[in-house]
């Protein structure tokens, strides 16, 4: 099965995740730990791959990232 992509990326939210994370001065390790407190297991390397567009993002992961980063899911998905 071929991995889906959008303009060469496996997600549309990675750049926004990185933008919000750096605005909040949170490291990838800190973001991973905070997301885990939301009940979703994401390691630092997964955060890195999400931000670089190399990894798909599940809906429940996007919801946890949204909560931790203080951004709406729509904003992370580029709709706002």
PLM segments and residue spans:
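Short, contiguous strand/loop micro-motifs
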Residues: 4-5, 48-50
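Hydrophobic micro-packing sites on short alpha-helices
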Residues: 31, 61-66, 76-77
